[in-house]
Regions:
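Short strand-turn-strand beta-turns centered on an Asx-Gly dipeptide
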Residues: 328-331, 830, 854-857
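Accessory carbohydrate-recognition regions in carbohydrate-active enzymes
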Residues: 17-245, 250-253, 396-569, 575-631, ...
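Positively charged n-region of N-terminal signal peptides that target proteins for export
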Residues: 1-4, 717
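Extracellular/secretory pathway-exposed regions associated with glycan biology
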Residues: 241-316, 320-395
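Short acidic, glycine-rich loop/turn motifs
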Residues: 144-146, 249, 265-267, 379-382, ...
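Sec-dependent N-terminal signal peptides
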Residues: 4-13
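ATP-dependent phospho-/nucleotidyl transfer catalytic cores
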Residues: 636
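Short beta-strand/loop motifs in extracellular/secreted proteins, especially
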Residues: 140, 172-174, 313-315, 323-325, ...
């Protein structure tokens, strides 16, 4: 009711945003960054953001859903909005985690069309011009050029208000798609049209790698329906080609199935192979071996045999794969999807005419390169879809995998049609309650005004006196991205847990990109919103209660994404910085389980923990990415040490301090780089591709990753400097990283690298590197993010670095000092105090610090503590355009 009261008191707002919200450009990060990448050529340097309209940490974000063309099969991009796409298929209420290469779930989409009714995404889509877009955090406007329809939209936490202004016509339609996401196809859905209530309601679900999470929705209109119906695209969603239609020769006779030949692709692994008859091609090996003699990474499968068509007619043959796949029929290459990419629930399809009773030679090739491995061969009778698509006058569809509804209205020119949408993960009734509570029947302007107030309140936490328009745009856009996630799942004081499927009282969050966000995003929230930080920790502990483990990367439930258990770091960092209000004993229990108990699934705990505790490292012949696991487990152990130290548990603190040095067991003194070890203690080949699934599987990529991962011991940087050969050798190592394009700010494991110069006695080099990255890599344009934003982490790195300090080692109350890239910054802290950062003599190229004072006292080391910030006061940097080797008297 509080939100609704705010709405009623607000004056009608115009389109222009006010306050710091007016500097936010939600299109930043929606296009590929133009700077290129050296560390791994196939990584896509895109922000993977989208123009999200929602409240801070909102449950449902609304964005245009775009595609590259109107051709079938082109709606394949993981992120819902891509700046270079030319068509909008609808306006989606999404739960895709901004900036991350992960999954959407429980989405719903609205699309206004006029003239001929079109419901398929590629057919209903409309071209648009970016000049007609008006995006802000609270609202979005655009003109659909093909229909002449103006769209205005605003949103709250879990609801949205729309206005569609059509040309004068008697065929103004709104299409409601219950399964619009690439990652929801194939899951059960339903939709109901209720003319008497002027509503369409339903549910959609998700079957990607996370726990299935059903999304419920209610769409309400401001007038009666002139006509309505449902549509069903089940028949366009393919089925696995059954065993009875597949044949191969075995011992001189034909048997059902296809012959699969499994081989390694990497030259260093040799031509190890396995052969078998597979009944169908429908595999989800995830991170496991596809065959006994085949490793879990970098392999290829070739299936061969014959295909029998049961009936004559046109079929759509389809392939879905993670990573690449291609298909030949009678020697002709029909599908060529040969490239590294994630698994899409929408297959790559090609039409082919088949004759009943005829056998066709079939060959399918598949390769796995990175992350999980999945592949599916499917087909569907193409002409059946057209016959059964539209069900006019039908008011309900249940248990459909691809369904939706449409309504028709009669409109006058210039008269807006209004619609409101409520969403929920609990029930349809809760979606309706969320709609009533948050926005009622208020229009776009009032809803946008209320959401703008929330954004301005949060963005105003940091003030930028003296900054120019470009600096404010980059900064406040980064702050907007930092305040989108984690996603609140709480609805009226309760939530449905994605970890056990039950409804619980209290509060929950999801889409914590913990491998990324423990580094800067969570420390930023701990500084600016410690009460929220406490709630986020409680959310992790609720997940522990409900599923038995703290998640590593919930989306919305457990996933096997990344290596360490960095919820440990989030909890330790929050606690040592004074955050309270969560169950400290439960946190200790959950962290100890991570550090000592082997999970019975790769999504739980630390994969390889039993070997890590037995050998002191994770062996390469047992687990992928063994070096990264060893390095990350050691850092997480250090975080446990700091947590138990703060609790007063000296014995445990000492134990985990000792464990935290195990990262040294994978430091190779011969190459002075990290290096994988086998379970017998011997070193693996220096060119072992195991270092990272993102290494590009070539020697240069492997070397680049080894160099970057060598630096990941943020808790023991003096030890890393010693390993590299001392100050001068470490300086040369870092110079090589930066000068030769080996360092990449868009990947997290070495984000702290610019600050390592501080530990070599060369803080002026930290200042120069940070200044260059901040001012070169972050821009106010769609291509203005140099990598995946990863739920705000890339933005948080910028925010700290632009302000002049950085949490190099979460779990420690210390921040490393760089150089401010803004003339002045004022932090309005939650305790009522202000902390001011002043850059004296600020100007272009003046990136070298002469001296730093804290409340008038000169600092002798490039460090400031968390309690110094909370006390309020002034941090003053005096800068110039030449290095000052005496800017600090003492070294770290």
């Amino acid at each position: 009711m509080k939100k609704l009261l705010i709405l009623l008191l607000l004056p009608l707002a115009g389109c222009a945003a006010s306050g710091p919200e007016r500097y936010v450009d939600p299109l930043v990060g929606t296009e590929v960054w133009q700077g290129g990448i050296a560390i791994a050529g196939h990584e896509e340097a895109s922000g993977y953001t989208f123009p999200a309209v929602t409240e801070p940490f909102g449950m449902t974000a609304w964005t245009p859903h775009t595609q590259a063309s109107k051709e079938p099969g082109t709606l394949h991009h993981r992120v819902p909005y891509w700046y270079s796409h030319e068509y909008i298929t609808g306006f989606i209420g999404t739960h895709y985690p901004s900036g991350a290469v992960m999954f959407d779930y429980g989405a719903v989409e609205l699309m206004p069309v006029s003239g001929t009714l079109r419901v398929r995404p590629e057919e209903r889509s409309s071209s648009f011009r970016h000049q007609t877009e008006r995006p802000t955090p609270a609202r979005y406007e655009v003109t659909l050029a093909d229909y002449g329809i103006d769209v205005r939209r605003a949103a709250s936490k879990s609801a949205a208000a729309f206005e569609f202004t059509y040309p004068e016509c008697d065929s103004a339609f709104v299409v409601v798609d219950a399964m619009p996401s690439l990652f929801t196809a194939g899951a059960p859905a339903s939709i109901t049209v209720s003319p008497e209530r002027r509503e369409i309601s339903g549910k959609s679900a998700q079957t990607a790698r996370a726990y299935r999470e059903t999304g419920y929705f209610v769409v309400r209109f401001d007038r009666d329906f002139a006509d309505y119906g449902t549509f069903n695209q089940n028949m366009d969603y393919p089925e696995v080609i059954e065993n009875r239609y597949l044949f191969t020769e075995q011992e001189g006779k034909m048997v059902n199935g296809l012959r699969g030949v499994y081989t390694h692709r990497s030259p260093w692994q040799g031509d190890i192979r396995s052969e078998r008859i597979d009944p169908v091609i429908d595999f989800d090996w995830d991170w496991y071996r596809p065959a006994d003699d085949i490793d879990v990474k970098d392999y290829q499968v070739t299936w061969s045999g014959q295909l029998l068509a049961p009936e004559s007619g046109e079929y759509l043959l389809g392939l879905q794969a993670d990573d690449g796949a291609r298909l030949w029929l009678d020697g002709e290459l029909l599908i060529d999807d040969w490239g590294p990419h994630g698994y899409s629930m929408t297959p790559v399809q090609r039409a082919v005419t088949l004759e009943a009773g005829r056998m066709y030679d079939l060959r399918v090739e598949y390769y796995q390169q990175e992350w999980s491995s999945r592949v599916k061969l499917s087909w569907v009778r193409h002409e059946e879809g057209a016959r059964r698509l539209l069900l006019r006058g039908n008011d309900r569809l249940e248990s459909s995998t691809k369904c939706g509804a449409y309504v028709r209205f009669e409109t006058e020119a210039g008269e807006p049609l209004r619609a409101w949408v409520g969403t929920s993960f609990i029930s349809e009734e809760q979606a309706r309650a969320n709609l009533e509570r948050e926005i009622g029947r208020n229009g776009v302007d009032r809803v946008a005004g209320a959401t703008s107030e929330l954004w301005n309140e949060l963005l105003s936490t940091i003030e930028l006196p003296g900054a120019d328009e470009v600096q404010k745009s980059v900064f406040y856009t980064a702050l907007y991205h930092a305040f989108l996630l984690p996603r609140s799942l709480s609805e009226d004081g309760r939530y449905r847990s994605p970890f056990d499927g039950e409804i619980h009282p209290g509060e929950s969050f999801t889409d914590y990109s913990l491998w990324d966000t423990f580094r800067a995003l969570h420390p930023l929230l701990t500084l600016l919103r410690p009460e929220l930080s406490s709630r986020l920790v409680t959310g992790l502990l609720n997940a522990y209660d409900e599923g038995g483990w703290m998640p590593k990367w919930p989306n919305p439930g457990y996933t096997n994404c990344m290596m360490g258990t960095h919820g440990d770091a989030v909890i330790a960092d929050a606690y040592v910085k004074g955050v309270r209000g969560f169950d400290t004993q439960k946190a200790a229990e959950a962290m100890l389980k991570n550090a000592n108990v082997k999970g019975n699934h790769i999504a739980w705990g630390r994969l390889g923990i039993e070997d890590y505790n037995r050998l002191g490292y994770v062996p390469v012949d047992h687990y992928r990415e063994s070096v990264a696991r060893t390095m990350e487990f050691a850092y997480d152990d250090w975080c446990l040490a700091r947590y138990f130290e703060a609790l007063g548990d000296t014995l445990r603190s000492r134990e985990y301090d000792e464990r935290s040095l195990r990262y040294r067991n994978v430091l190779d003194p011969e190459t002075r780089l990290v290096r994988a070890r086998r379970s017998d203690g011997e070193w693996s080949s220096p060119s072992d591709y195991d270092i990272s699934v993102w290494s590009g599987f070539n020697e240069q990529g492997v070397l680049n990753y080894r160099k970057n991962y060598t630096l990941f011991a943020p808790h023991d940087i003096p030890g890393v400097v010693d390993f590299l050969g001392g100050d001068r050798a470490a300086e040369a190592f870092l110079d090589d990283l930066f000068d030769n394009g080996i360092y990449y700010v868009g990947d997290e494991f070495s984000m702290h690298a610019p600050y390592i110069y501080n530990f070599c006695g060369m803080p002026w080099k930290t200042q120069r590197r940070v200044y260059d990255i901040v001012n070169t890599y972050y821009l106010p344009s769609p291509s203005g993010l140099p990598g995946n934003d990863d739920c705000g982490q890339l933005s948080a790195w910028y925010l700290f670095s632009a302000m002049g300090f950085y949490p190099m080692c979460p779990g420690s109350p210390e921040y490393q000092l760089g150089v401010p890239c803004l003339p002045e910054v004022v932090l309005h802290l939650p305790n009522g105090r202000d902390f001011r950062i002043v850059c004296e003599n600020f100007g272009p190229g003046r990136c070298y610090v002469r001296q730093v004072t804290l409340n008038g006292r000169r600092l002798t080391r490039p460090v400031i503590r968390h309690e110094d910030l909370l006390a309020g006061g002034e941090l003053r940097f005096t800068v110039g355009d030449t290095p000052a080797t005496d800017c600090y008297e003492a070294r770290l």
